[in-house]
Amino acid sequence: MDAHTIIVAATAIAVGIIFGAAGLGSAIGWGLITSKTIEGITRQPEMRPQLLVNTFIFAGLMESFPFIILAFGFWFLFANPFLG
């Protein structure tokens, strides 16, 4: 196998791992955001509207992370800087 094939194969494996980690991180983030919101609503029900607004703001910020990782992953796949 030549060096080009090895680099392409290693990049494909690495990008798959990166995509999996980004998905797992996003799922954990959603779980933490949701659990803390429910916990806050349980403690102070009158704060429900403010907590929900904050939840959706932080959830939107947290969801941007996998899309940024997706862009970097596709950059490594299709415009691989390691191939020269």
From Swiss-Prot:
Where is the major localization of this protein? Answer: membrane
GO cellular component terms, A-Z: plasma membrane; proton-transporting ATP synthase complex; proton-transporting two-sector ATPase complex, proton-transporting domain
Mark the transmembrane ranges.
Answer: 13-33, 56-76
Could you tell me the keywords of this UniProt record? ATP synthesis, Cell inner membrane, Cell membrane, CF(0), Hydrogen ion transport, Ion transport, Lipid-binding, Membrane, Transmembrane, Transmembrane helix, Transport
The residues forming the signal peptide are none
Q: Which compartments is it annotated to reside in?
A: Cell inner membrane
Regarding the membrane, this protein is recorded as: Multi-pass membrane protein
Query: GO molecular function terms here?
Result: lipid binding; proton-transporting ATP synthase activity, rotational mechanism
Kindly give the Gene3D superfamilies that the UniProt entry links to this protein.
Answer: F1F0 ATP synthase subunit C
Site for Reversibly protonated during proton transport, residues: 63
Oligomer and partners: F-type ATPases have 2 components, F(1) - the catalytic core - and F(0) - the membrane proton channel. F(1) has five subunits: alpha(3), beta(3), gamma(1), delta(1), epsilon(1). F(0) has three main subunits: a(1), b(2) and c(10-14). The alpha and beta chains form an alternating ring which encloses part of the gamma chain. F(1) is attached to F(0) by a central stalk formed by the gamma and epsilon chains, while a peripheral stalk is formed by the delta and b chains.
- Which family does the similarity line name? Belongs to the ATPase C chain family.
This chain's function reads: F(1)F(0) ATP synthase produces ATP from ADP in the presence of a proton or sodium gradient. F-type ATPases consist of two structural domains, F(1) containing the extramembraneous catalytic core and F(0) containing the membrane proton channel, linked together by a central stalk and a peripheral stalk. During catalysis, ATP synthesis in the catalytic domain of F(1) is coupled via a rotary mechanism of the central stalk subunits to proton translocation.
Q: What is this protein called?
A: ATP synthase subunit c
Gene from which this protein is expressed? atpE
